C-alpha cells in the first residue's frame, strides 16, 4: 500500500511539472505579447504530453570518449533525488511525521551538486565541464545562506518538524526581508533566471547538460522543475502560512508564478556580482539572523 501511494505521489508530481512548464510558456508568451502553445489539444492543454513523447521517442547517442555509464545514469539519479525531496513533506497518507526529516532535506540538496558536476565531467566536453563547475560553485555558495535562513526558522519555531512548523504562525515583520533573500537563494539554487549562469548561451551554450538530448534531457528537465515546485512548497511551510490547505495552495501558486515572472522580467545577472551578492550580503545577513535567534533563546 505504501508503494502504491509513493507511485501515485510521484505521478502527481510529474504531471504537475508537465503543466507547470505549459504555464511557464503561456506566461512568457503573454509577457511578450504572443499566443504561446495553442495547437495541440484545446488551447494547447496537452502540449507537454506531445513534448514528452517527442523527447522520449528520439534516438539516443552517447558522445565519443565519454564515460558512458555515468553519462546515462546521472539524469535518472537527478530525477530520483528530486522526487525523494517530496518524501520529507508531511502528509496524512504517507506516514512521514518524523521530527528530523529536515535533516534529510539538507542531505539530499547537498547530494544534487554531485549530479551537476559529474554530468558535466562525464560528457567529455569542455563546455559542459565548465558549465558544471560554474553551476556547482553557484549552488554550493547559495546553499550556505539558504540553509542558515532555514535554521533561523527552525530556531524561531523551536522544532525540526515540518508538521509543527506548518501549524505555527509566521515569524513577524522580519519574515518579509528573510523571504526576499530566501527567494533569491532559491532562484540561484535551482539555476533559474536571472541567475541561470549554467546556461549562459553566449558563453557555455547550455551548461552542464549541453550533450544531453531526447529522453536524458527530459529527465534533467523534470528534475529541475520538480525542485522548483518543492522549493515553492517549502517556502510556504517554513516562512509563510500553511495551517489551512486553501491558503497554503494559493501561496504555493503565487511563489511558483514569482519564479516565472522573475524569468520574464529580469535580465541575466553578472556572475561576479552574483557571487559578491552571496558572500558579502546574503551570508552576513543570514549569520545575523542566527545570532538574533540565539539571543532570543538566551533571553
Swiss-Prot record:
Keywords: Electron transport, Membrane, Mitochondrion, Mitochondrion inner membrane, NAD, Respiratory chain, Translocase, Transmembrane, Transmembrane helix, Transport, Ubiquinone. GO terms for biological process: aerobic respiration. GO terms for cellular component: mitochondrial inner membrane. It is found in: Mitochondrion inner membrane. It is a multi-pass membrane protein. Core subunit of the mitochondrial membrane respiratory chain NADH dehydrogenase (Complex I) that is believed to belong to the minimal assembly required for catalysis. Complex I functions in the transfer of electrons from NADH to the respiratory chain. The immediate electron acceptor for the enzyme is believed to be ubiquinone. This is NADH-ubiquinone oxidoreductase chain 1.
Amino acid at each position: 500500500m505504501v508503494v502504491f501511494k509513493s507511485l501515485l505521489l510521484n505521478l502527481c508530481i510529474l504531471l504537475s511539472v508537465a503543466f507547470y512548464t505549459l504555464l511557464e510558456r503561456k506566461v512568457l508568451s503573454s509577457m511578450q505579447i504572443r499566443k504561446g502553445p495553442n495547437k495541440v489539444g484545446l488551447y494547447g492543454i496537452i502540449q507537454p504530453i506531445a513534448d514528452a513523447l517527442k523527447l522520449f521517442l528520439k534516438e539516443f547517442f552517447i558522445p565519443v570518449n565519454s564515460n558512458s555509464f555515468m553519462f546515462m545514469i546521472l539524469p535518472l539519479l537527478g530525477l530520483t533525488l528530486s522526487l525523494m525531496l517530496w518524501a520529507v513533506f508531511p502528509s496524512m497518507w504517507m506516514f512521514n511525521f518524523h521530527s528530523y526529516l529536515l535533516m534529510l532535506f539538507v542531505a539530499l540538496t547537498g547530494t544534487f551538486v554531485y549530479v551537476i558536476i559529474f554530468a558535466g565531467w562525464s560528457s567529455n566536453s569542455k563546455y559542459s565541464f565548465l558549465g558544471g563547475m560554474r553551476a556547482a560553485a553557484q549552488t554550493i555558495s547559495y546553499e550556505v545562506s539558504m540553509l542558515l535562513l532555514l535554521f533561523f526558522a527552525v530556531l524561531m519555531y523551536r522544532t525540526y518538524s515540518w508538521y509543527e512548523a506548518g501549524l505555527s504562525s509566521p515569524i513577524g515583520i522580519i519574515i518579509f526581508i528573510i523571504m526576499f533573500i530566501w527567494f533569491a537563494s532559491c532562484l540561484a539554487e535551482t539555476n533559474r533566471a536571472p541567475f541561470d549562469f549554467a546556461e549562459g548561451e553566449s558563453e557555455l551554450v547550455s551548461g552542464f547538460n549541453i550533450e544531453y538530448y531526447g529522453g536524458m534531457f527530459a529527465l534533467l528537465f523534470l528534475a529541475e522543475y520538480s525542485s522548483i515546485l518543492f522549493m515553492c512548497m517549502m517556502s510556504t511551510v517554513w516562512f509563510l502560512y500553511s495551517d489551512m490547505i486553501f491558503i497554503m495552495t494559493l501561496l504555493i501558486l503565487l511563489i511558483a508564478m514569482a519564479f516565472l515572472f522573475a524569468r520574464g522580467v529580469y535580465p541575466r545577472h553578472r556572475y561576479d556580482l552574483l557571487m559578491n551578492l552571496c558572500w558579502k550580503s546574503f551570508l552576513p545577513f543570514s549569520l545575523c539572523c542566527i545570532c538574533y535567534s540565539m539571543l532570543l533563546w538566551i533571553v
